[in-house]
Amino acid sequence: MSLADSVLAVNNDLPIRTDKPVHSGKVRSVYWLTDTDSRRLIRDKGYDVPEDTPLAIMVISDRISAFDCIFHGEGDLQGIPGKGAALNAISNHWFGLFAENGLADSHILDIPHPFVWIVQKARPIKVEAICRQYITGSMWRAYSKGERVFCGITLPEGLSKDQKLPELLITPSTKGILTGIPGVPAQDDVNISRSDIEANYQAFGFEKPQDIDLYETLLKQGFKVISDALAKLDQVFVDTKFEFGYVNDKNGQSKLIYMDEVGTPDSSRIWDGAAYREGKIVENSKEGFRQFLLNHFDDADILLNKDRMPEREALARDNDLPLDAMMNVSRTYIGVAEKVTGSSIPLPANPKADIIKVLREQYDLIV
């Protein structure tokens, strides 16, 4: 089989039994199971959730998105070899470490395959929970233009690009387009302040005001667990994005949990520690791919200017990226995953066929 065959690019066409539309995100697709199948799996697999909890199959792809677009490579390479398996392996490892440290639960109930999670339905918080330990990226771009207030936080004078911040900062943004919130534009990924959340906590999905403190605590705790573990590997945990939601426990009590992925090269910046001490930035995250794109195309403003989105979409659609650039990303993702987990990352030759086989034989979910 060719390299392209080993990439799972389309993940929303699996013959999984469902009575609802498949939700297709940039990287993952979600198949909501029937009530009958959800109840059967909860009973037969012994999942520690109420018997009427809706379950879903979440399938990751190898697609790569940057600047809100999906990119592809030469030779009909529609994704990054090993990327999906690497991302899931990293998240699985961190969620396990969270459990060992007594942090909150995640939405994951079972891992049938390197590309697949069985998850419980959650009521999502509509906040991208971003934590920053270093000034770089969008924060540095704003700071270098003279802005000193970022997400309601006043930054000190005299900061330099890529330096460690005096303290860990929480700089949230909106998750999805939210309407009717005073002072918050109805756009995706808009920076917001803690005071915005406090004044409109229900609009952001919080069930009670005290949970704002809880989400910040869980964010800081999760950041510290990952940062401490990466430091032992001489890697710098620069910044990251977490997501949270509510589920009910077996007693019907609502609880806040971690959702989506955590501490991955997609959701975080990770720098090589040795290089950083020498004054250089070596990216072990998707940021390296973003920088490649900014240098690869003649007009980088297309990638940065939200008013040029149609041009950006055409740029991504009409350009095959060099194979070596795609494989560099593959090596980065697999390398980080193997460092973090201490294990090799299995790369199926035909991931779609493998997923169908497992879900048919072990879960009876294939039609």
Swiss-Prot record:
GO terms for molecular function: ATP binding; phosphoribosylaminoimidazolesuccinocarboxamide synthase activity. InterPro entries: SAICAR_synt/ADE2_N (IPR028923), SAICAR_synthase_Vibrio-typ (IPR014106), SAICAR_synthetase_CS (IPR018236). It is an enzyme of class 6 (ligase). GO terms for biological process: 'de novo' IMP biosynthetic process. GO terms for cellular component: cytoplasm. Pathway: Purine metabolism; IMP biosynthesis via de novo pathway; 5-amino-1-(5-phospho-D-ribosyl)imidazole-4-carboxamide from 5-amino-1-(5-phospho-D-ribosyl)imidazole-4-carboxylate: step 1/2. Its EC number is 6.3.2.6. Transmembrane segments: none annotated. It catalyses: 5-amino-1-(5-phospho-D-ribosyl)imidazole-4-carboxylate + L-aspartate + ATP = (2S)-2-[5-amino-1-(5-phospho-beta-D-ribosyl)imidazole-4-carboxamido]succinate + ADP + phosphate + 2 H(+). This is Phosphoribosylaminoimidazole-succinocarboxamide synthase. It comes from Shewanella frigidimarina (strain NCIMB 400). The gene is purC.
